[in-house]
Amino acid sequence: MLLVSCLIILLHLQNALSQIIPPNERCVTAVYTAYEYLSFSGQPNKGLWAPRCRNRLHVLSIYAASDLYCSDAEREAGFAQLDDQCRQYAGVDLIPRQEFAPNLTHEAISQMRVVEFGELPKKGPLDTPILISKSYYSRVFRTIDAWQFELWSHYAFGYLGYAYWTVVIAAGALHKLVLHAISVKRAPSLPPFPFLLLIYYWIQTNLIIPAPLASSRRRLLWWTFPGRIHAIVVLLFWILSIVLCLIGYRTFSDNIYWPDISAQLLRYVADRTGILSFANVPLLWLFAGRNNIFIWATGWSYSTFNIFHRHVAWIATLQAVVHTILYTVLFIQSGNAWKKMQKPYLLWGTLAMLAMILVFPFAVDWFRRRTYETFLVLHILFSVVALVGCFYHVIIFEDHEYWFYLWPAVVIWVSDRVLRLIRIVYCNLHVQLGSRSRFQCTECVAAYDKDADIIHLELTPGSGLQPAPGQYYFLYQPFRLTGWESHPFTLGYWSYNDGAPSTQCRSLKRDTTTDVSEIPLLPDTPSSGSDYGSIDTSTDPPERKLALRFWIRPYDGWTRHLRDQCLQSPTRIIQPNILLEGPYGEQCPLWKYESVLLIAGGTGIAAAVPYIQDHILRSSTGQTSTQSIHLVWTARQPALLRDIAGRELKQALSRKDFRVSFYVTSESASQGAIMDGVEFACGRPDLQAIITAHAEEARLGSSSVLVLVCGPSGMAGLARAAVHQAMRWGCRSLRYVEESFDW
């Protein structure tokens, strides 16, 4: 996908450069362009290229003026180019210079009439060769030179955007590499250049970890960013995009195309913004894809690239709007604006611009979170309309040179959809030779817990997936009217069952369920979502089936529909047809840190439990450096705490290296016990105090510490601010990881 897109863009670069007239050809080009404002008698005298190539008076005048104003090298290159264009566009050869040799002597040229620009009307045919004056030639040359510079700058500035994101991605990949190196080589074996480590810690403390502003608030202007580095990357691209639209314009008052400087600026800026908008189209589709290779290369989340996607979309849309407005002004100034606007390619361009604008009202957080299905349909519809409109808008250009910006988007979109389909088949269909049922598909049980307001979803996939912490899947309910929609959920827990899921999702047969912590630890193998390694459970007993568990909070749309389906059952348990797509996500090497603090809010516990599972599994054979884990979990309903603490966390609660702090925010709750020996407190935790104490304890013990947070944005903002403060106070062995999914 990425390789094909890069090849298309490189071909576009080659094609774009071929449109730029080389400097050694511009002298002759300026000469024959100047003669387009004069008319000569004789044949041929119709069209653009035929008179320029075969009208004897016209061609003789071009040769004569070139002898005066061009060097030998410029004449050789320029006339070779003109001859090629005569064959390409007129199907004829340029009249050779030898046929005019007697008329091109110094004496003959000196006797030719010299004219200034605008001195002779174009409609009056001339019956003698004419020389253009030096000022006439200079004026045309400056015009062509300025136009060629503008063409070059339009393309070059578009590629500057690609260069910017290349640097950003490279920095992200380097950061991932440094993180891996630091987690492997701890304090006893620091790198030979400690000042490089100090620079890295300074970047972490001042650029990567903090909130966008000094406070813990995530809003900057009217945008939301998880961290300061996200805001910096986005704002720099905004600045770059604005600057590239404002600089690099060569204007002068004698321009033969647009004598008025304001008209020159209107045309140049209109072209610049249109081309830059097109240049952003491949980035738009690349950053929106689930199967984005840069997610793996950098270790950044899908949410991070989604932030980039939104801002590139904002910029591309504003550039398209400016492009449309400025061309409308140009049409009004030149007259017959309404007639020009009725041309099909302009109507397609206007439609594309309007579709880009209409995407935004339905993509705001408020609308997207409440009516995700509607947002998804409209987002795809308007995006396709915009892309098709862009194709037809530039169909009038030779060689379809601007399609090179659009085809990568098509390739990226198709490739991403094909890879999604492959993942769906892999996750949900499994062929077993020699068994009674050769084809096995995903089986599902969903149960709604009214007290906890949670849907417990357990799926037995049809393939040999290797679950790991940090994974998330997209879920489809294919037999709904909108069955093509998918919704992301973090994998909360996994186990191995004898046969299909129980018909009582929350009362699974305990004698036929094997917790992964009871399975012998196998050698580490890299997982699909991590280069740190994961636990390989692929050799489990063949009679046991993997069961994946998800906790879903019903809101609007599909989750509410699933809850209503459960409520229609007397037992609140159903067996819907649900398909998996995945796994996605990156596993954090939690086992390489001596102390771990897990902070979860509500169903954010799904991000923490798999790491606890993984820790129990690794600690049974000593394949972990983690000595203590502290889980701080806040939920609205005590029932949710009680349910998961009594099942998924039951084994962990009996361990000495694991402790919990449960908080209930419901106003009707009173302090009490979740289960025997496990209590909860009312209200919200003091994350500042908890993180500070944890970091100080780790600093005094010279141990590494990791803080992993998954919860509401307010909770994550407070945790990030507390971690930032601890790092400023000198806790350099502290790492912050935020698990979130924003769509």
UniProtKB/Swiss-Prot annotation:
Induction: Expression is repressed by iron in a sreA- and acuM-mediated way. Its cofactor is FAD; heme. Heme 2 binds at residues 323, 393. It is a multi-pass membrane protein. It comes from the Eukaryota. Keywords: Cell membrane, Glycoprotein, Ion transport, Iron, Iron transport, Membrane, Metal-binding, Oxidoreductase, Signal, Transmembrane, Transmembrane helix, Transport. Glycans are attached at residue 103. Its EC number is 1.-.-.-. GO terms for biological process: cellular response to iron ion starvation; copper ion import; intracellular iron ion homeostasis; iron ion transport. Residues 411-590 form the FAD-binding FR-type domain. GO terms for cellular component: plasma membrane. Residues 1-18 form the signal peptide. Residues 273-389 form the Ferric oxidoreductase domain. The chain crosses the membrane at residues 154-174, 193-213, 229-249, 275-295, 312-332, 344-364, 377-397, 402-422. Residues 503-540 are annotated as: Disordered. GO terms for molecular function: ferric-chelate reductase activity; metal ion binding. Heme 1 binds at residues 309, 379. Belongs to the ferric reductase (FRE) family. This is Ferric/cupric reductase transmembrane component B. It comes from Aspergillus fumigatus (strain ATCC MYA-4609 / CBS 101355 / FGSC A1100 / Af293).
